[in-house]
Curated annotation (Swiss-Prot):
<dbReference type="GO" id="GO:0003746">
    <property type="term" value="F:translation elongation factor activity"/>
</dbReference>
<comment type="similarity">
    <text>Belongs to the TRAFAC class translation factor GTPase superfamily. Classic translation factor GTPase family. LepA subfamily.</text>
</comment>
<dbReference type="InterPro" id="IPR009000">
    <property type="entry name" value="Transl_B-barrel_sf"/>
</dbReference>
<keyword id="KW-1003">Cell membrane</keyword>
<dbReference type="InterPro" id="IPR000795">
    <property type="entry name" value="T_Tr_GTP-bd_dom"/>
</dbReference>
<dbReference type="InterPro" id="IPR000640">
    <property type="entry name" value="EFG_V-like"/>
</dbReference>
<feature type="binding site">
    <location>
        <begin position="145"/>
        <end position="148"/>
    </location>
    <ligand>
        <name>GTP</name>
    </ligand>
</feature>
<dbReference type="GO" id="GO:0005525">
    <property type="term" value="F:GTP binding"/>
</dbReference>
<dbReference type="InterPro" id="IPR027417">
    <property type="entry name" value="P-loop_NTPase"/>
</dbReference>
<dbReference type="InterPro" id="IPR038363">
    <property type="entry name" value="LepA_C_sf"/>
</dbReference>
<feature type="binding site">
    <location>
        <begin position="29"/>
        <end position="34"/>
    </location>
    <ligand>
        <name>GTP</name>
    </ligand>
</feature>
<dbReference type="InterPro" id="IPR031157">
    <property type="entry name" value="G_TR_CS"/>
</dbReference>
<keyword id="KW-0472">Membrane</keyword>
<dbReference type="Pfam" id="PF03144">
    <property type="entry name" value="GTP_EFTU_D2"/>
</dbReference>
<dbReference type="Pfam" id="PF00679">
    <property type="entry name" value="EFG_C"/>
</dbReference>
<keyword id="KW-0342">GTP-binding</keyword>
<dbReference type="Pfam" id="PF00009">
    <property type="entry name" value="GTP_EFTU"/>
</dbReference>
Length: 618
């Protein structure tokens, strides 16, 4: 008999005892989406002819980069010993920027599959997500993936996994998402080992939102896990954090295509459609209840997504400003963590200050704007939010160097993160050197096995948002992995460095940096601009300044015409007169002349070397 269930349990009439909710947690590239594909095939939910790789990753960028950005939930039938079970698989993002989404997806489950690449072993984000799963008291099934690879070392990593979560290396399942080996055994183990969901079917309805997606035709599709009670179509529901109420137009399950049902009961995972057009109306982590019979208390763990990294986005062509505004509005419909406000720059024109969860979020948003809306954008160097206290006790929050107050400053506080770095032990020295150079304070070090080490540091967020990850990868030959989470604020000695051209400040090049690094930034920026700005008829000084104190200077030499070319021989006083006249002209020119900074110079000065390499590859 095929283990595929002959009669799949019907939504809204499913006994919680036969429901199993689980998610797959893994580091990027450990084969999470491929394993999900094999499960969809094994359970017969997706026919072989419709199958495509990374079936659940719907966005082009997700498929190209091989990463999962939005969570997905799929209901699959599976039969064990003659009983048909309903398995709800919630696919989660693996990247550190999307940790909050992962934590909500974990809260919607009773169990988690801890997936580890048999050729690479445990990585930093696997650990971070494992700790999240343990905090949520999930039952964990350890699994080694990619055992078909020639470089796989299943015995070594099975022992590492077993020592990490306690248990026997023999209990670690070995599967291959590519060939499908061991997938059926894994599905059987999910049914046997994971607990059934618990909840009160007669209590007022409570369902937790773990994701919401904007659909052009149907509005916001909200994915929920029902904890108590029942939800039915055509009921009026209420969001408990915003108190907004909506009518349920459609309710159903994804299998994996949306299938409407008569409702959702305790323990079930499905989707709701209310016709709302903005994902901010259904926030991830919020509780949905019945308006007529509301629940007294919302489910725990809800938090507003808070942007950590800010960057200015400007269209290369000023006429594209309205297009950029519309594009950001549309992206906001699908991305509750994105915030933006208009800003102007004397150098770059009109644009927006946009807040992101992290650098990957910034990169993906920018790529989507350029690709889906055909925009050419300049993005300014990413920076973080500082809290500046003035001497009159007034507090200013600064996300843009041009907003930095000029008065008497009592103290500046900057956001901190606690970072966990995993790497082979031969790179410990290089990692410590890197973290020390970024003002890091060591928090501890643990050996996971004889050749893998976990290093914990507390670092300023501003030091890791720019190029920390790239340098870490190159110093550890690609073996290092990083995970971080916000960890309060601390007082720091920060200054604003202004770049001036001929005494005029250029706001786009200003930066807030630590006093020790201000000189290095000034020298780097003035040197870069000297090469990029074309020579003028007069000498142009490029200066870096903190307040009124100049800390670095470069000069662009003047182009001069050879005024003596027409003098053949002749009197020295004649030549001197011509030279003096030229000198006077240059002096007058310098008084009234302005320096135009070409667009190319802006782009080149604001992009890091890494993004230049990317542009060359294009």
């Amino acid at each position: 008999m095929s283990p595929m269930a002959r009669t799949a349990p019907v939504p809204a009439a499913t006994d919680p005892a036969i429901i199993r909710n689980f998610c797959i947690i893994a580091h990027i590239d450990h084969g999470k989406s491929t394993l999900a594909d094999r499960m969809l095939q094994s359970t017969g939910v997706v026919q072989a002819r419709d199958m495509k790789a990374q079936y659940l990753d719907r966005m082009d960028i997700e498929r190209e980069r091989g990463i999962t950005i939005k969570s997905q939930a799929v209901r699959m039938p599976w039969e064990v010993e003659g009983v048909s079970y309903a398995l709800n698989m919630i696919d989660t993002p693996g990247h550190v920027d999307f940790t909050y989404e992962v934590s909500r997806s974990l809260a919607a489950c009773e169990g988690a599959i801890l997936l580890v690449d048999a050729a690479q072993g445990i990585e930093a984000q696997t650990l971070a997500n494992l700790y999240l799963a343990m905090e949520n008291n999930l039952t964990i099934i350890p699994v080694l993936n990619k055992i078909d690879l020639p470089a796989a070392q299943p015995e070594k990593y099975a022992a590492e996994l077993a020592s990490l979560i306690g248990g026997d290396p023999e209990d670690v399942l070995r599967v291959s998402g590519k060939t499908g080996v061991g997938v059926e055994a894994l599905l059987d183990k999910i049914v046997r080992d994971l607990p059934a969901p618990e909840g009160n079917p007669d209590a007022p309805a409570r369902a937790m939102i773990f994701d919401s997606v904007y659909d052009t035709y149907r509005g916001v599709v909200t994915y929920v896990r029902v904890v108590d009670g029942m939800l039915h179509p055509r009921e009026r529901i209420q969001m408990m954090s915003t108190r907004a109420s909506h009518e349920l137009l459609e309710i159903g399950v994804s299998s994996p295509e949306p299938t409407p049902s008569k409702g959702l009961g305790v323990g079930e995972v499905g989707y709701l459609i209310t016709g709302v057009k903005d994902v901010r109306q259904s926030k991830v982590g919020d509780t949905v209840t019945n308006l007529a019979k509301p629940a007294a208390q919302s489910l725990p763990g809800y938090a507003d997504a808070k942007p950590m990294v800010f960057s200015g986005l400007y269209p290369l062509d000023g006429a594209d400003y309205p297009v950029l505004r519309d594009a950001l509005e549309k992206l906001m419909l699908n991305d509750a963590a994105l915030v933006y406000e208009p800003e102007t720059s004397a150098a770059l024109g009109f644009g927006f200050r946009v807040g992101f969860l992290g650098l990957l979020h910034l990169e993906i948003t920018r790529e989507r704007l350029e690709r889906e809306y055909n925009l050419d954008l300049i993005s300014t160097a990413p920076n973080v939010e500082y809290e500046v206290t003035l001497e009159d006790k007034k507090v200013v929050r600064v996300t843009n160097p041009s907003e930095y107050p000029t008065g008497k400053i009592a103290e500046v506080r900057e956001p901190m993160v606690s970072a966990t770095i995993l790497a082979p032990n031969e790179f410990v020295g290089a990692i410590m050197e890197l973290c020390q150079s970024r003002r890091g304070v060591m928090g501890g070090m643990d050996y996971l096995s004889e050749d893998r080490v976990e290093i914990r540091y507390r670092l300023p967020l501003a030091e890791i948002v720019f190029d920390f990850f790239d340098i870490l990868k190159s110093k550890t030959r690609g073996y290092g992995s990083l995970d971080w989470k916000a960890d309060g604020e601390q007082v720091a000695d920060l200054v604003k460095v202004d770049i001036m051209l001929q005494g005029e400040q250029v706001d786009a090049f200003s930066a807030i940096t630590h006093r020790e690094k201000a000189y290095a930034y000034g020298v780097m920026m003035t040197g870069k601009l000297r090469e990029l700005i074309p020579r003028q008829q007069f000498e142009v000084p490029i200066q870096a300044a903190i307040g009124s104190r100049i800390i670095a200077r470069e000069s662009i030499r003047a182009i001069r015409k050879d005024v003596l070319a027409k003098c053949y021989g002749g009197d020295i006083s004649r030549k001197r007169k011509l030279l003096e006249k030229q000198k006077e002209g240059k002096k007058r020119m310098k008084m009234v002349g302005t320096v135009e900074v070409p667009q190319e110079a802006f782009i080149a000065a604001l992009t890091t070397d890494e993004s230049k390499d990317k542009a060359k590859k294009k």
